[in-house]
Amino acid sequence: MKIIRVQDQLEGGKVAFSLLKESLAEGATTLGLATGSTPITFYQELVNSDLDCSALTSINLDEYVGLPVENDQSYDYFMRDQLFNAKPFKESFLPNGLADDLEAEVKRYDQVIAEHPIDFQILGIGRNGHIGFNEPGTPFAEKTHVVDLQASTIEANSRFFASIDDVPKQAISMGIASIMASKMIVLLAFGKEKAAAIKGMVSGPVTEALPASVLQQHDHVVVIVDEAAASELD
């Protein structure tokens, strides 16, 4: 696990984008993508570059259950707004949170991942150590699954909604085993509220109580942190 300390989120996005360009030069064709505020500067770098994404495939980590894609808090909307409208990919996959049969959708998404192995996976990290929507206690062997979101996650995401009651209570998430199958993982974390999770991920025991700690067992992880997020590291 390589730690890169940066001044701020802007620099973090630039560093992540430079790592992406290196991976693409080495033949990467499938990107695993994340949502939320953390990767926005990475997407800005991508959008402002001359990179042609028309031969690339993207697979997103997760999607809320029950939000229409035209809702501006759906991850489908987020990805179009932040990246895909400006940089179309050959194929872009997201879980379908409106599927009538969620278990069938989970199986479909696992098949998508199996057919398009991820070369370069972007991650954020939750305050409770979640990656994707894999909450504490999620088995490391889990593949794509339907998640009941923890109260802390619902509260953290409530700032994006008119009321906490509007925050979806479930999501479909790529599983920890799916994430770990990625060839390279780049995890971004900014802000003091991520410091404890970063410390546990980097130097704590590998435990399902802190999902991100499993990344200690991956061969190619780069962690990009600002000073606040790195403040509890030695």
UniProtKB/Swiss-Prot annotation:
GO BP: carbohydrate metabolic process; glucosamine catabolic process; N-acetylglucosamine catabolic process; N-acetylneuraminate catabolic process
So what EC number does this one have?
3.5.99.6
Report which reactions are catalysed by this protein.
alpha-D-glucosamine 6-phosphate + H2O = beta-D-fructose 6-phosphate + NH4(+)
Q: Name one GO cellular component term.
A: cytoplasm
What keywords sit in the KW lines? Carbohydrate metabolism, Hydrolase
Please give the InterPro entries that the UniProt record associates with this protein: Glc/Gal-6P_isomerase, Glucosamine6P_isomerase, Glucosamine6P_isomerase_CS, NagB/RpiA_transferase-like
The pathway it acts in is: Amino-sugar metabolism; N-acetylneuraminate degradation; D-fructose 6-phosphate from N-acetylneuraminate: step 5/5
Superkingdom of this entry's organism? Bacteria
Looking up PROSITE patterns in the UniProt record yields: GLC_GALNAC_ISOMERASE
Question: One Pfam family from the UniProt entry?
Answer: Glucosamine_iso
For whether the record's keyword set contains Hydrolase, the answer is yes
In alphabetical order, the GO MF annotations are:
glucosamine-6-phosphate deaminase activity; identical protein binding
**Gene3D superfamilies, per the entry:** 3.40.50.1360
Query: What is the role of the protein in this entry?
Result: Catalyzes the reversible isomerization-deamination of glucosamine 6-phosphate (GlcN6P) to form fructose 6-phosphate (Fru6P) and ammonium ion.
Q: Which HAMAP family match?
A: GlcN6P_deamin (MF_01241)
Family label:
Belongs to the glucosamine/galactosamine-6-phosphate isomerase family. NagB subfamily.
What name does UniProt use for this protein? Glucosamine-6-phosphate deaminase
Q: Which organism is it from?
A: Streptococcus equi subsp. zooepidemicus (strain H70)
- Cite the source lineage: Bacteria, Bacillati, Bacillota, Bacilli, Lactobacillales
